[in-house]
Amino acid sequence: MGEVQEGPKVEQEKKPAATVVPVETTDGKPKSGGGDSAAAAAPPVAAVVSAFVYKVDMHCEGCAKKIKRMVKHFDGVKDVTADTGGNKLLVVGKIDPVKLQEKLEEKTKRKVVLANPPPKVEGPVAAAVGEKKADGGDKEAAPPAPAPAAPKESVVPLKIRLHCEGCIQKIKKIILKIKGVETVAIDGAKDVVTVKGTIDVKELVPLLTKKLKRTVEPLVPAKKDDGAAENKKTEAAAPDAKKEAPSAGVNEAKKEGSDGGEKKKEVGDGGEKKKEGGDGGEKKKEAGDGGEKKKDGGGVPAPVAMVNKMDYYGYSAYPTAPMHWQEGHVYGQSYSMTGQNYPVGGQSYPGSGYNYASESYVPYAQPNVNAPGMFSDENPNGCSVM
């Protein structure tokens, strides 16, 4: 019985030796310690609870809650505090701060900066970290690339089509979420959105066009040429004005020539126009100019003699007999003529009212004219000796 029990004991003693061999040759390199020392060769970087401060761009309270929820799911985190005003995130726990930083940058798509670096590691942990650095030393030995220069603060006016108040609030909310934007001022009447902050216009315009799904145009202020553009315009307009000057003179001359006849009529009109023509020297000049323009214009001469005859006719002591409607047979028209008086100062035609009658004329009645008046030049109906 004793020999049978010794067999299993020998096997149990050989088992630890079998387990030690693979541990020593795991990485293909001999290690100084046993299995327990090899397992404890890579402990976590932060063995104690510590607090780390990260700088993350947080726009609002909702953004801060989202980041806090994301960090709490990370292993070893005990507490998370977010400061929206200062864009700071305080994380407390047994964590690797560098891994958490990379995780946050991957999830939020934003730049995350570790404000307080982790404390220096001493002992076996430092040796393990040194070996890791030695493995990837070529990558970390390269000098860091110089950081791009931060854009200066600027004010950018943009032309965006605005429909209503809800549309304005939506656009304002979208623009404020863009990194680097500080304030947004919107003028709904002019469809102008003014953005202030440390932003690049070349990157902002295509980004807003994609997010808003409408045309976005930057408004560039007009350059001051110190009047150079105006001088060029005046110089270009000067030869055109010279070309137009002679043609305008010809048109005016034609117009004046065509108006000659009208001006002659003004000269040869009735007594009132004659009086006006005799009032001042200026109007006489106009009358004289009308005569000269008659030669140029070639208008038809006005019947001056007929006008004078009518003047004589109006004031003559021997007027012609007027024409009257003939007395009707059907409707009864009565033009009872009591008689005609020919006073020296004028004439009168007494008669009764009007009635409808047939259409015919009474022949002229020859007035009683004295012998000297028949041959007078002032009488338009007088006789003349040939």
Curated annotation (Swiss-Prot):
PROSITE patterns per UniProt: HMA_2
Modified residue annotations for Cysteine methyl ester: C383
Keyword terms of this UniProt record: Lipoprotein, Metal-binding, Methylation, Prenylation, Repeat
Molecular function terms from GO: copper ion binding
Domain HMA: 49-112, 153-220
Record-listed a metal cation 1 binding positions: C60, C63
Protein modification: Efficiently farnesylated in vitro.
Region (Disordered): 1-40, 129-153, 223-301
Propeptide: 384-386
Family named by the database record: Belongs to the HIPP family.
PANTHER family: HEAVY METAL-ASSOCIATED ISOPRENYLATED PLANT PROTEIN 5, HEAVY METAL-ASSOCIATED ISOPRENYLATED PLANT PROTEIN 6
Name assigned to this protein: Heavy metal-associated isoprenylated plant protein 5
Source organism phylogeny: Eukaryota, Viridiplantae, Streptophyta, Embryophyta, Tracheophyta
Gene: HIPP05
